[in-house]
């Protein structure tokens, strides 16, 4: 991640020039705003709601409902303030520097410390507030706010993946797509809060919507002309959009198996819904359906807040020696193991 600066994406610049948002003079469709009041969204020249702008989806609200809230769906204002205070304190990387926390398996060895001291709290940008609805989880269905159980097939698949990650990496293909800077953490799809780079820019042009994620500077170009999905798997699948009233619906399938949302497979089918509910709020909802991974589909809601900030220029592998050193470390582990074997055979 590098200092904030304006990103000029060619495709975005081109489509931006062709769209001038206007407020509809005769719009008959209204949306229920965040405060429960009727609100008419501004519209683009082709008559659709104007979703354009940069939207911030930072929040401390977790994906799944914490057990401490049990059947509580919505927090009171006082409970939300206390939860925010606790979450901000617990995530302070400087204050919690000395606390051991598992960081997974690296080259076959469990890691419990940030030995490189790579990320102090300056670099994190997780957010400090719960979502505006004060829901206890982003998951809205099932009603318990929890992601459904894995299927037996998925449990075996994930266990095998964990075993494979315990051995030293033979090449970059053995590392995650995040470490390889192919896909990034919160950008999805579906989008979900993460550690930083939590903005998304939406640009509309006749027949297209472009979704530009700050993380990994990924841009999804979504056609709205009813074209078929085809059958070519891609990292972020193939997205096709349509309007249902004032809601933009994006249907995505044909994911590569390596993409993996929480252990999902290439059977993943994703439906995203974008609804502008007031001048400063874009309600983002997504439904995940993968019968080879979860026992039933699940849905999450993530209200996004309009921001006047610019998009970070995200740099991942430029000047990054982490992957090279990781693979060098793996070769060192193998060398030490081979030397130990020779000694024991004497």
What is each stretch, according to the model?
Residues 2-346:
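PEST-like low-complexity, intrinsically disordered acidic/proline/serine-rich tracts
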């Amino acid at each position: 991640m590098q200092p904030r600066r304006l990103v000029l994406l060619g495709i975005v610049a081109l489509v931006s020039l062709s769209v001038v948002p206007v407020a509809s003079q005769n719009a008959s469709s209204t949306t229920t705003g965040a405060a429960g009041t009727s609100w008419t969204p501004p519209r683009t020249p082709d008559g659709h709601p104007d979703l354009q702008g940069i939207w911030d989806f930072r929040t401390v609200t977790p994906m799944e409902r914490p057990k401490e809230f049990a059947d509580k769906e919505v927090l009171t204002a006082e409970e939300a303030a206390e939860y925010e205070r606790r979450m901000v304190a617990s995530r302070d990387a400087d204050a919690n520097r000395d606390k051991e926390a598992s960081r997974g398996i690296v080259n076959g060895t469990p890691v419990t410390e940030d030995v490189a001291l790579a990320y102090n709290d300056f670099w994190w940008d997780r957010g400090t507030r719960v979502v505006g609805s004060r829901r206890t989880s982003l998951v809205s269905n099932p009603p318990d706010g929890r992601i459904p159980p894995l299927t037996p097939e998925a449990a075996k698949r994930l266990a095998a993946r964990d075993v494979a990650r315990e051995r030293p990496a033979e090449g970059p293909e053995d590392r995650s797509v995040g470490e390889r800077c192919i896909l990034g953490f919160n950008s999805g799809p579906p989008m979900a809060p993460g550690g930083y780079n939590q903005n998304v820019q939406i640009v509309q042009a006749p027949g297209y919507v472009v979704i530009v994620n700050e993380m990994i500077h990924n841009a999804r170009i979504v056609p709205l002309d009813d074209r078929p999905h085809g059958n070519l798997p891609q990292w972020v699948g193939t997205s096709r959009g349509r309007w249902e009233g004032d809601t933009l619906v994006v249907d995505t399938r044909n994911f590569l198996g390596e993409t993996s949302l929480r252990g999902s497979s290439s059977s993943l089918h994703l439906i995203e819904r974008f609804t502008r509910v007031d001048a400063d709020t874009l309600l983002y909802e997504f439904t995940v359906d993968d019968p080879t991974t979860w026992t039933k589909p699940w849905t999450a809601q993530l209200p996004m807040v309009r921001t006047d900030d610019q998009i970070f220029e995200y740099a991942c592998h430029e000047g990054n020696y982490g992957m090279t050193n990781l693979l060098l470390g793996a070769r060192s582990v193998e060398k030490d193991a081979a030397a130990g074997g020779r000694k024991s055979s004497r």
